[in-house]
């Protein structure tokens, strides 16, 4: 089982022949999309978050409000029929840049993401998870990286194990380079991509499939560095998309150590790829 998990972790989800072709593609410009480089007045971001867990309302809003990037909106999709939308709108109605929608729980995560993108007003989409941590410079760094590719995000990330208070790094040496996949909670892309690639109608692996489909269409993926984001492992309190126990997951990471405050480790506000508006 461990060998299978290790193979799954390091897999780039693309066969050898396609990898060779992609290496050639990475040296070429994205001329097929004819998307002009952004100028400052054009760069506005639609942050989308899908959740079926009411307890993360505070975290969703804090991640958004923490961002130093000013020109943005937040679209929240509630994907559980038991969730009371009025409990969210009572708080969000005072913020004109935040909109909340409720989608039937029978609909997949991929469906919800596509729904949110259709509602988005701006020309950059940033997919944020409900339970992770996004530092103040997260959006600024991601937006600036769009000059390298039409889809950006992180492959190497910090991981924080809440129960043991352990900070670690996964997928090391996958920073500031073109890659074959990106971590789902860190996907940031130009909205024009949605005309070519959409999320598949499923709730597991929709982010990996999105990356695969981008590659098939000749759309490059660029990974920034690991700073400004932490993947939070909540232990037994939550069911994660990848159902693997913490102790086994730690063996797939580089352990930094036991820390109470991981924020001081992961925030890097002097990033070269910083863009403040």
Each language-model region and where it sits:
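N-proximal low-complexity "stem/linker" segments adjacent to membrane-targeting elements
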Residues: 1-66
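Glycine-rich, basic loop-to-helix element that forms the pyrophosphate-binding segment
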Residues: 103-120
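Short beta-strand-to-loop acidic/aromatic patch adjacent to the donor-nucleotide binding site
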Residues: 122-134
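Catalytic beta-strand/loop signature of glycosyltransferases that borders the donor
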Residues: 155, 221-228
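Acidic donor-binding loop at a coil-to-helix junction in glycosyltransferase catalytic cores
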Residues: 204-210, 219
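Nucleotide-sugar-dependent glycosyltransferase catalytic core
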Residues: 219, 232-256
């Amino acid at each position: 089982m461990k060998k299978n998990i290790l193979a799954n972790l390091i897999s780039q989800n693309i066969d050898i022949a396609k990898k060779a072709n992609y290496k050639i593609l990475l040296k070429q410009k994205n001329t097929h999309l004819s998307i002009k480089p952004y100028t400052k007045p054009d760069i506005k971001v639609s942050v989308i978050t899908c959740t079926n867990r009411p307890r993360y309302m505070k975290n969703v809003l804090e991640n958004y409000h923490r961002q130093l990037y000013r020109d943005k909106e937040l679209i929240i999709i509630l994907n559980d029929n038991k969730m009371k939308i009025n409990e969210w709108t009572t708080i969000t109605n005072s913020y004109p840049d935040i909109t909340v929608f409720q989608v039937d729980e029978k609909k997949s995560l991929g469906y919800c993401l596509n729904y949110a993108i259709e509602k988005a007003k701006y020309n950059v989409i940033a997919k944020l998870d409900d339970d992770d941590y996004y530092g103040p410079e997260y959006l600024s760094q991601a937006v600036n990286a769009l000059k390298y590719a039409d889809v950006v995000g992180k492959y190497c990330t910090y991981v924080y194990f809440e129960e043991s208070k352990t900070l670690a790094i996964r997928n090391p040496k996958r920073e500031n380079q073109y890659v074959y996949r990106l971590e789902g909670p860190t996907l940031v892309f130009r909205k024009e991509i949605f005309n070519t690639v959409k999320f598949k109608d499923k709730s597991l692996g929709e982010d990996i499939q999105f990356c695969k489909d981008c590659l098939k269409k000749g759309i490059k993926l660029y990974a920034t560095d690991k700073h400004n984001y932490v993947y939070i492992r909540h232990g037994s309190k939550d069911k994660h998309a990848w159902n693997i126990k913490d102790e086994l997951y730690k063996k797939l990471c580089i352990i930094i150590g036991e820390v109470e405050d991981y924020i001081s480790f992961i925030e890097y506000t002097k990033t070269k790829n910083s863009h403040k508006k």
